[in-house]
């Protein structure tokens, strides 16, 4: 990047729409289920038929409150719904029911690890609203599927507290992880159950001003989010540099863009509307939502251990590195897998490496998730225990791991019974003979070892393991090698 760009910084905030996994829609009994035939999960309410009246889904409120507890937000005892008026084919009522003036949650924060540093990203508010339908295009024609219309959402609005793409991605991934842990949404980006809108402006470094922001709609991957933010930052800086004497508000008008991944650029969709354009007013068909402290406290008590807390526990209780702990807690199912394995294996550091690196890497290559791969936590624990007990070597363990991936459900003991040739060599006489031959063939390494160069010992061990195809027990190799060297 040019040195000119280095004098500027981005100011980033996110608006995240999260579909809640309730059984029915927000204001009607129509099913909330993705993938059904178009326009089969609809009602008079979500299609806006005259005379239909909304009834608030209690489960959606509980899930919103649970999120508020998880982010340590201020949960309003009194909140209210408003109508946001706009015309679009996917909104048959020509308005959305949302919370504009009095949201259910104010404030809160998302805890994240950014490049090894603990960070807190502040939230402005979280409110409940219903989703719109979906336009589906068929050549020159378009149809509308109202199955999604009326699906309950929470919209999570952050403060403009991020200053680079890495911040935004860390915030987004940490938010998804938190939502997964508390179980209020499946957060399936491909199905649209979580959608990210990114607001970004730029300013000279050190300046406190907030200039006009541009919204980039519907980021459906974290990689695209990072790319779009970087490209938009450069576009805005170029505009300001090319028009240095112009009012900044006129240089970058508030607008909505989309990301074009093929052209690697943001593309203008429309200029921004103001709040007045939406003609917000209180929803006349819904009463004020009233909560009690005891209701909130009852929901708070159902919170599970959250990712950030689990991260610190893994470091303190299991002695894991920050990097490994961060990988484990990023996925609730992986964390659960690891904790189940910990019941049968107490070498937590080695176990965490096998879960994240060895089996995690194999699963990534095959395009599967570890918890659904057919590998069981007990099997991984058994494998690590076998290494620690000298039953197998690390090299053989990797071969067994490959076989476990090929034969889902089989544990190391079963594989070793079927393939006894994988067991380490048990003929100590043969091993002593190989050690003597290696020592005889490497006189320079013997001299180095005698002169205190410890690397020479590692070299000799490596030669022995090579001669035995990795089947010699490393611990016993070291013992016998030292005995052989002491003879001289």
UniProtKB/Swiss-Prot annotation:
It comes from Chlamydia pneumoniae. Pfam families: GatB_N (PF02934), GatB_Yqey (PF02637). Its EC number is 6.3.5.-. GO terms for biological process: glutaminyl-tRNAGln biosynthesis via transamidation; translation. HAMAP family: GatB (MF_00121). Belongs to the GatB/GatE family. GatB subfamily. Keywords: ATP-binding, Ligase, Nucleotide-binding, Protein biosynthesis. This is Aspartyl/glutamyl-tRNA(Asn/Gln) amidotransferase subunit B. It comes from the Bacteria.
